[in-house]
Structure formats: structure tokens, C-alpha cells
Design a protein with these regions (language model features):
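Pepsin/retropepsin-fold aspartyl endopeptidases
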Residues: 1-134
Length: 134
């Protein structure tokens, strides 16, 4: 966590927000993910993809990284569950230090970052889905 100072006074603490997420593919895994509002899509490691039963991602997509480089990553769909909410979301498979929860998943789940409380909060009411996704 980083403390921001103004004239020697601490005015804010800036840190990363992590969230426990249950991901469902062919198999289900609960994982701690870094919430990244600068990432459009969620990104998981090949090992986590394998644990979800994603042996070969359905698609390959070209993405631009934060440093400007463009690379191809595998892409598939998983069901994300957070705090009683669930929604299908795109997961990219690539080398990451920790799993990333991107904006597409947050929007699908109806969640936003509350920086003051350092957690996710609802952005809208959530309607429970009774049908399947596929």
C-alpha cells in the first residue's frame, strides 16, 4: 500500500484490491484475483485454465498490453461468481503473475470499485438468472 502525502499530511492510501472469485468452466475453482479497472478482460494463467477444464481456448485474440505491445492470447468463456452474483465473462489465457479480474466481468456482475472502502460494491440491483448460459 502506498500513502500519498500533501505537506506532510497523509491524505489517502492507495493500494491494490483483490477479490475472491469463483470461476466455472468444465470445472470450478475459487481464486483470489487482482481487480484491474485498466484491463478490459480478465486474464488467467495456463495452469488456472487447465484447472477450469479449458484445455484449448475456443478463440485466439490480439490484445494490446499496457506497454503498447500487441500479442495473441487464447480466449474462452467462464462463469464468474462474486458475492452471490454470477455472470458469463471472457477470460484470456496468458502468462500473468496473478489472475486479473477485468472491467468486462465487473460490468457483467454489476460491480464497481469503491476506492475508499477498498472493495467491490454493487453498481445496480442484481437479478438472479434462472436459465443456463450456453
Amino acid at each position: 500500500m502506498i500513502a500519498l502525502l500533501a505537506y506532510g499530511q497523509e491524505v489517502a492510501k492507495v493500494g491494490h484490491i483483490h477479490q475472491k472469485v469463483r470461476l466455472k468452466g468444465e470445472k470450478t475453482v475459487t481464486v483470489r484475483m487482482l481487480v484491474d479497472t485498466g484491463a478490459t478482460y480478465s486474464v488467467i494463467s495456463p495452469l488456472l485454465a487447465e484447472k477450469l477444464g479449458i484445455k484449448r481456448p475456443r478463440r485466439s485474440v490480439r490484445v494490446r498490453l499496457a506497454d503498447g505491445r500487441r500479442i495473441r492470447l487464447g480466449a474462452d468463456i467462464a462463469i464468474a461468481q462474486v458475492d452471490g452474483r454470477e455472470a458469463p465473462t471472457t477470460v484470456l489465457v496468458g502468462k500473468v503473475d496473478e489472475p486479473i479480474l477485468g472491467v468486462e466481468a465487473l460490468e457483467a456482475l454489476g460491480l464497481v470499485v469503491d476506492p475508499g472502502k477498498k472493495r467491490l460494491t454493487p453498481s445496480r440491483p442484481y437479478a438472479v438468472r434462472l436459465g443456463g448460459y450456453r
